[in-house]
């Protein structure tokens, strides 16, 4: 199976919102929520996609002809590509009831681990979602990253116990999920965290902690102050705040602000090809997350669909590196791309 076949297979399985488009650019689903769309006028996911396409790569084939190494080492683990499957929750609501969160995470975590990368898993109001996700990660020898919502502190403590039992090599919190309605309405309240609160949570985690949802230099410096091991430059695919800038627009300034800090920087939002991955690394990211296309991969081909999508992205990255005269991720520098 290739990814094109996977898309075709996914269409009958997905609900009425996601169209399993050949190019997942946010246009067909736009402001559909429930569904995979963006909040408000619905242009943030589209902007994410478009801004990567406005960056061009600089070809240079006067270079040593040697094998390309696409591997990334993060927190002591080495991965085949600098690509991670992003966390997705409530798949029945947004993508159709052929799969539930438990089954989705189980397929995704296992397939990603078998094909050399790792998956971030989603969270939800149903406690069984995190229970099953961390079990899948444990079965994959810790090769997964549970993503905990910014619940109240007692709920976070319960989730962290599951994380510890899973042996996950890192844990994340999508701090920007504070913009999701179901979190706002909880009692006791969930949502935004202060630097002090985040510091306490990071100490509780006791494992490399990734803060997802950073879109400003100020936010990045707060995550650094709290003790984060990594951040993810992300606007939650436009699903939590209307009319955000694209992640590609803010990435470089955040990279410069954290220079020399040792904090790893990942980025998501509209990255849809191995060439886009190359662009993100050229702007200073250590790795990327891709979310929505992995949903199509799982719905359209289960584990084989995930394998097909990873192969597609990896092959494209390798080809771009070769044609730009670089043989390792460290050699991908700012002069490898052109911005306008």
Residue ranges of each PLM-predicted region?
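Conserved active-site-proximal phosphate/metal-binding subdomains
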Residues: 1-27, 219, 238-261, 272, ...
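An N-cap/entry alpha-helix motif that binds or orients negatively charged groups
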Residues: 2-80
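N-terminal functional module of multi-domain proteins
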Residues: 44-130
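Structural signal for hydrophobic packing residues in well-ordered secondary-structure cores
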Residues: 49-59, 112, 116, 164-167, ...
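Active-site mouth loops of central-metabolism enzymes
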Residues: 88-100, 145-154, 207-215, 272
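Flexible, glycine/proline-enriched loop segments at strand-loop-helix junctions
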Residues: 95, 121-122, 144-151, 183-189
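Alpha/beta enzyme core
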Residues: 109-110, 138-139, 151-267, 274-297, ...
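Long, hydrophobic, well-ordered secondary-structure blocks that form the structural core
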Residues: 118, 129-155
């Amino acid at each position: 199976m290739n990814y094109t076949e996977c898309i075709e297979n996914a269409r009958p399985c997905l609900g009425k919102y996601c169209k399993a488009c050949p190019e997942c650019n946010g246009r067909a689903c736009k402001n559909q929520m429930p569904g995979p769309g963006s909040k408000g006028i619905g242009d943030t996911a589209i902007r994410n996609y478009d801004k990567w396409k406005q960056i061009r790569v600089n070809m240079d084939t006067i270079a040593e002809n040697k094998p390309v190494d696409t591997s990334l080492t993060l927190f002591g683990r080495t991965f085949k590509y600098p690509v991670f499957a992003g966390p997705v929750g409530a798949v029945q609501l947004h993508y159709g009831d052929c799969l539930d969160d438990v089954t989705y995470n189980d397929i995704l975590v296992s397939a990603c681990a078998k094909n050399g990368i790792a998956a971030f898993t989603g969270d939800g109001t149903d406690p069984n979602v995190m229970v099953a996700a961390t079990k899948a990660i444990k079965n994959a020898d810790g090769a997964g990253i549970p993503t905990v919502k910014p619940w109240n502190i007692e709920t976070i403590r319960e989730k962290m116990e599951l994380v510890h039992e899973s042996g996950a090599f890192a844990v994340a919190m999508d701090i920007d999920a504070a913009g999701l309605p179901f979190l706002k309405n909880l009692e006791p309240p969930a949502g935004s965290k202060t630097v002090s609160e985040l510091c306490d949570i990071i100490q509780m985690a006791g494992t490399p902690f990734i803060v997802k949802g950073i879109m400003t230099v100020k936010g990045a410096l707060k995550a650094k102050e709290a003790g984060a091991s990594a951040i993810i430059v992300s606007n939650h695919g436009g699903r939590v705040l209307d009319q955000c800038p694209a992640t590609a627009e803010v990435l470089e300034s955040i990279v410069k602000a954290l220079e020399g800090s040792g904090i790893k920087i990942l980025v998501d939002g509209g990255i849809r090809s191995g060439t886009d991955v190359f662009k993100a690394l050229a702007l200073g990211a250590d790795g990327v997350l891709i979310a929505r296309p992995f949903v199509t991969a799982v719905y359209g081909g289960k584990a084989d669909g995930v394998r097909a999508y990873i192969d597609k992205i990896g092959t494209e990255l390798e080809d771009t590196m070769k044609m730009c005269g670089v043989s390792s991720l460290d050699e991908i520098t700012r002069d490898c791309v052109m911005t306008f």
